[in-house]
Amino acid sequence: VFPDLNIKYNIEIAPYFTGQDSEKEFFNFYEKCDLLTGMRFHTNVCGIALNIPTIGIKTYQKLEDLYLEIGLEERCLDVNQENFFEQYSKELQDTLLRKKEIKEEYIKVKKKLIQDKDKKYILLKEWLSK
């Protein structure tokens, strides 16, 4: 999958942090990553929020919906797709090569989400005041 063996073996699985302030350890661990990939919703949400390139692995609809809603549907792969492993391998390599570009795309997506939230808040506030 990886032509460079250093890349192949420089992979870590996030530990299970527990207890008070464990979220700090969790986010510190994530911030050291070049790429996050997983099927868990929070793995993907946190990666996007931290501007860490993600590859979502769809095993249930909620994850695909996240990527569709924010316009990043190409960053989520369906594990049941016939050529999943080839596509996943290609996406891993491409993501590592395009890290900076993907981070910039995430920043734009988050800015748009904030603008959308602000517009909805104004509409809600107007509706409630009637």
Label the model's feature ranges.
Residues 1-130:
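Active-site anion-handling motifs in enzyme catalytic cores
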